[in-house]
Amino acid sequence: VTTDPLLLTGDVDDATTRLIRTAARFDAADLAQPSLLPGWTRGHVLAHLSRNADALVNALTSARTGELIPMYASTESRTADIAAGAPRPPEEQLDDLRRSADRYAEAVAAMPAPAWAATVQTRRGPLPASLLVWRRLREVEIHHVDLAADYRPRDWSPAFGHRLLHEVATDLAARDDAPALVLRFDGTSHELVIGDRAQAPVVSGPAVEIAAWLTGRSPGATLTVTPDGQLPHPPEWI
């Protein structure tokens, strides 16, 4: 996946189209079914994706204007908005998903080139504006899987899987609760190391499948562990 936000917009558009296609098939009973996220229904996931699009509009507007605009008014309001949006009828969910995605796309289109160099404030700290489009792609692709419909990590592109794997491995390497791991993907010449290599089992497999396992979106049944044994348990990641 490219790091150029403008080139990534096409990937976001395609991912959004796939997401909306899935969401359009849900009736009220489907939306009330559990998602892959503990405590969240499919309705919660869709409401979150809509509010995430609007939060990114705030971040993009902040980068473009120089005004300090928080992505969310507060953690409490973010949680409340998702809870309030979860039980809505299917047609309202779908309309919100489409309209919020359109607002996000318009905010990206309004960005002048210099604005991508700005730094914006997110819930997890400062972030270059140039990474906001990737963040939206990541949200849509991962949470599409969380809908527990027919979209799986195997449907992610290899480029997306590679970038996600590198990002997650980098994040986990900075955490104290992550197990030591050597991640060997797409052949023995490509690997990432988390923690003390000398104490780490080697987990091997396609990059997409390792990324899905590390993010908790797959049990990793197709991965191999050397020396033989069970896969370690990575900590929760988004």
PLM features: residue spans?
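Structured surface interface patches that mediate subunit assembly and partner/cofactor docking
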Residues: 2-7, 61-71, 110-238
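Amphipathic, well-ordered alpha-helical segments in soluble domains
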Residues: 15-18, 22, 52, 100-103, ...
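Alpha-helical scaffold segments that form or flank carboxylate-/histidine-based iron centers
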Residues: 2-11, 30-52, 80-93, 120-138, ...
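Soluble acyl-CoA-dependent acyltransferase catalytic core bearing the H(X)4D motif
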Residues: 2-14, 18-21, 62-82
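Conserved alpha-helical segments that form or flank metal/cofactor-binding pockets of metalloenzymes
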Residues: 43-74
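Residue-level signal for well-ordered alpha-helical scaffold segments within enzymatic catalytic domains
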Residues: 21, 44, 48, 58, ...
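Ordered, amphipathic secondary-structure segments that act as subunit-interaction surfaces
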Residues: 89-112
